[in-house]
């Protein structure tokens, strides 16, 4: 008998935000967004209990299946990061964009379009309303810019969590300028900063920096508590089970799922 706990869904203001959200007139396919895939709102505790806020960029094909953000390769890397900080459940992850992107050059300039920004700020305001968030990590430049835009508002100025900007979890793309070691060196700096400033982790842990590459221990299973009921365990423990073709198309694309 499987007895996995599952995410029972957002509550309060978070639930309202999942009931009323921007449509494809805001996130237009012509602007580089996969609006036909639908919005993917969060992962973690959308119920006012989070103490760590994680901001990413946008959901991809794995997230389109699980309906939770940061659940693919990037998600498992981020899970390892937050668990190194001692957070096993008291975190909330949101993205700068609530819809996926098929063209970065077209979509990212819309980061602070009025309707996109206003909706994102509502999520951030809801996250801070209970008064429990004590630290914020932004992964990548769009996430950092989204946080900076919020901090310029009266609501953002009223909160003072510790913040650190880290590289995007998949910044070490093959053939790119950022190596795996560059990424992990950057994350080690972030770990040191957070370790000195976090007051209430779920579990107190000694600082355990990354080496030159990810180890199996650095890539933990994403907790079933973060997903809707019935999601299979292999979807939480494997990478690249949801893929697109080398030329996936624009707003419309086929997702191939390989069951291990």
Go through the PLM ranges and name each one:
Residues 1-260:
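A polyanion-binding, active-site-adjacent surface
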């Amino acid at each position: 008998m499987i007895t996995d706990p599952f995410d029972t869904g957002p509550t309060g203001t978070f639930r309202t935000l999942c009931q009323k959200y921007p449509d494809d007139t805001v996130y237009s396919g012509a602007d580089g967004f996969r609006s036909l895939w639908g919005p993917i709102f969060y992962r973690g505790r959308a119920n006012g209990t989070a103490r760590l806020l994680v901001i990413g960029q946008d959901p991809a094909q794995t997230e389109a299946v699980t309906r939770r953000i940061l659940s693919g390769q990037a998600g498992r890397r981020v899970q390892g990061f937050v668990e190194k900080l001692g957070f096993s459940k008291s975190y909330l992850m949101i993205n700068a964009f609530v819809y996926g992107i098929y063209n970065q050059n077209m979509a990212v300039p819309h980061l602070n379009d009025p309707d996109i920004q206003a909706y994102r700020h509502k999520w951030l305001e809801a996250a801070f309303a209970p008064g429990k968030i004590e630290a914020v990590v932004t992964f990548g430049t769009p996430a950092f810019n989204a946080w900076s835009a919020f901090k310029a508002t009266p609501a953002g100025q009223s909160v003072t969590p510790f913040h650190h900007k880290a590289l995007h979890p998949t910044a070490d793309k093959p053939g790119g300028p950022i190596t795996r070691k560059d990424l992990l060196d950057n994350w080690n700096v972030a770990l040191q900063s957070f370790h000195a400033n976090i007051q209430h982790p779920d579990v107190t842990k000694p600082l355990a920096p990354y080496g030159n590459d990810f180890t199996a221990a650095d890539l933990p299973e994403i907790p079933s508590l973060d997903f809707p009921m019935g999601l299979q365990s292999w979807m939480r423990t494997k990478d690249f089970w949801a893929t697109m073709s080398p030329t996936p198309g624009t707003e419309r694309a086929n997702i191939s799922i390989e069951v291990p």
